[in-house]
Each structure stands twice: as structure tokens, then as C-alpha cells.
């Protein structure tokens, strides 16, 4: 009866929240960039529209599964305690059915309007995030973000393959950029929310190894990220405009990581986290602008 009443109280905004729309939007930006970088011609409108819609639906389905599996953890954390399942506005079964419907519709669109490889890579990414990361790694190891980050790094590869139909070095390099970006991004948030993660018994790196150790690894990963972001220029995938942007954005990220490591600002952790979001958006936009600038030279 409680489950039924919960489902009756749920509105469309609750189900939209299950999909983590802000996260999906950032994923779609990287997917779009992957599509446009894959071709010197225009991207077919059907691939552009339905390919990204399919990727978004699958990502939303994975996010909904994350809400279901993390509902007890979410209820213990200030950042997440008002999520639909944590507050009981949506019951687990309707949320799972919603996730399944999104995933099936997304897969159908990808199979119809892109290609089978894109669909299966998207499915692998969905399962990697929803099952491997959320269901196991998140609760099992402080390296959860490092290992599980591969699933979240897939969108530019999915966009590229949706257009080209095959995997090549360039989209894998885009995946590598997001893969290297993920640890400093999430560990900065984990430092800011350390007590909440400890209360929820989630073995995030600041909880298991302390803040100083985590800050050092944020700094090291930011250095790795800076080096990785220079590779598109090194392999002639991008030009001088991207190089300048990558250096400027990366050095600013490194400055944030250094300030965090030195402990000279009280809110450096959340500042680093927020900067990392804008950083990734700006970096991929720079890749896109540089791509079309090179085509017109």
C-alpha cells in the first residue's frame, strides 16, 4: 500500500529528476562534439537528432537505476536526501520500470538511426555505470571513480561511432581525456562531502586515505589530464586554437588543484569541483570550434 501511495504521489518532475538531466546534458555536449569531429561533412540530421536522443535516454535509464540502488545511501546524505526515491516520492519498482523503458527506447533509436556498434557500446556504458559502478565498485573500493569512470567517459566515442560506424584512435583519445578528468572532478566533491560519505559508509578516497592523500592525487591526476589534453594537437587532430585553450584551461585547473593541495582556501574543494565542470564544457567546445576553423583554412 505504501508503495502504491508513493507511486501515486510521483509527478513528472520526479521522474525527470531520476534521469539526472544536468549530467545528461554535459554528456550530450561531449557526444555532439564526437559526432561533429568524426566528419568533414555535415552530420545527417537523423543521426544528430535520434542518435543523441538514444544516448540521452540510455544515460537517463542508467541514472534511474543509480537512484534505485543508492536510495538508502542518498537518504543519509545532505546533497541527495531530497531525491525522489530517498524521500519516497517514487517507489523502486516504478523507477526500475521507467529505467527499463528509457533504455529499451534508447537502444531502439540507436539501432534504427545509427548502427549496431553504437547501440552495443551504449549498452556496455549503461551496464558499466548502473551495474558495475553503482552496484559494486562504489561500495567496494576507494578507486571506484577511477575504474568506473570509463563508463562515464564513453559519450564522445558513442557520438563518433554513430557517424563513422567504427572505432579509431581519435575518439578513444576523447574518452581518455574524460577518463583522466573524472578523478580530480569527483574527489574534489568527495573532500567537500567527506563526512556525508563516511556516514553513508562509502569508501571514497578522502574517507579511506585522508584528505592530504586525496589532494595529492587530485594534483597528480590534473597534471596527467593537462598532458593528455595536449595529445589531440600532437597527433594533428586539432590546431593552434585548441592548443592555446587546452593550455589555458588546464593551467587554471592545475592552479585550483595546487591551491587545494596547499590548503590555503577554505572552500577550495568545492571551487575545484565547480571549475572542473566548466573546464570540460569549454575544452570540448574548443575542440569543436578548432575543428571547423581548420576545415575553413
Swiss-Prot record:
It is a multi-pass membrane protein. It catalyses: heme b + (2E,6E)-farnesyl diphosphate + H2O = Fe(II)-heme o + diphosphate. Pathway: Porphyrin-containing compound metabolism; heme O biosynthesis; heme O from protoheme: step 1/1. The chain crosses the membrane at residues 23-43, 45-65, 93-113, 117-137, 145-165, 171-191, 216-236, 241-261, 277-297. It comes from the Bacteria. One of its GO terms (cellular component) is plasma membrane. Belongs to the UbiA prenyltransferase family. Protoheme IX farnesyltransferase subfamily. The keyword Disulfide bond does not apply. The keyword Transmembrane helix applies. Its EC number is 2.5.1.141. PANTHER family: 4-HYDROXYBENZOATE SOLANESYLTRANSFERASE, PROTOHEME IX FARNESYLTRANSFERASE, MITOCHONDRIAL. GO terms for biological process: heme O biosynthetic process. This is Protoheme IX farnesyltransferase 1.
Amino acid at each position: 500500500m505504501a508503495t502504491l501511495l508513493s507511486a501515486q504521489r510521483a509527478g513528472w518532475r520526479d521522474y525527470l529528476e531520476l534521469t539526472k538531466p544536468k549530467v545528461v546534458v554535459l554528456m550530450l555536449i561531449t557526444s555532439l562534439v564526437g559526432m561533429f569531429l568524426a566528419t568533414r561533412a555535415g552530420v545527417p540530421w537523423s543521426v544528430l537528432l535520434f542518435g543523441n536522443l538514444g544516448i540521452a535516454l540510455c544515460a537517463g535509464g542508467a541514472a534511474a537505476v543509480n537512484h534505485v540502488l543508492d536510495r538508502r545511501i542518498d537518504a543519509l546524505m545532505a546533497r541527495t536526501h531530497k531525491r525522489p526515491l530517498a524521500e519516497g516520492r517514487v517507489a523502486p519498482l516504478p523507477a526500475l520500470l521507467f529505467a527499463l523503458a528509457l533504455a529499451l527506447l534508447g537502444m531502439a533509436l540507436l539501432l534504427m538511426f545509427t548502427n549496431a556498434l553504437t547501440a552495443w557500446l551504449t549498452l556496455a556504458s549503461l551496464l558499466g555505470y548502473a551495474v558495475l559502478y553503482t552496484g559494486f565498485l562504489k561500495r567496494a573500493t576507494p578507486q571506484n571513480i577511477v575504474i568506473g569512470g570509463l563508463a562515464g567517459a564513453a559519450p564522445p566515442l558513442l557520438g563518433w561511432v554513430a557517424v563513422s560506424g567504427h572505432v579509431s584512435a581519435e575518439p578513444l583519445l576523447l574518452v581518455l581525456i574524460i577518463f583522466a578528468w573524472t578523478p580530480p572532478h569527483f574527489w574534489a566533491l568527495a573532500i567537500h562531502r567527506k563526512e556525508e560519505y563516511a556516514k553513508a559508509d562509502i569508501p571514497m578516497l578522502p574517507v579511506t586515505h585522508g584528505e592530504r592523500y586525496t589532494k595529492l592525487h587530485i594534483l597528480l591526476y590534473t597534471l596527467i589530464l593537462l598532458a593528455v589534453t595536449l595529445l589531440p594537437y600532437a597527433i594533428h587532430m586539432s590546431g593552434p586554437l585548441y592548443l592555446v585553450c587546452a593550455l589555458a584551461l588546464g593551467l587554471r585547473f592545475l592552479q585550483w588543484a595546487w591551491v587545494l593541495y596547499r590548503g590555503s582556501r577554505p572552500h577550495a574543494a568545492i571551487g575545484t569541483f565547480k571549475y572542473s565542470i566548466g573546464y570540460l564544457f569549454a575544452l570540448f567546445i574548443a575542440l569543436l570550434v578548432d575543428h571547423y576553423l581548420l576545415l575553413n583554412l
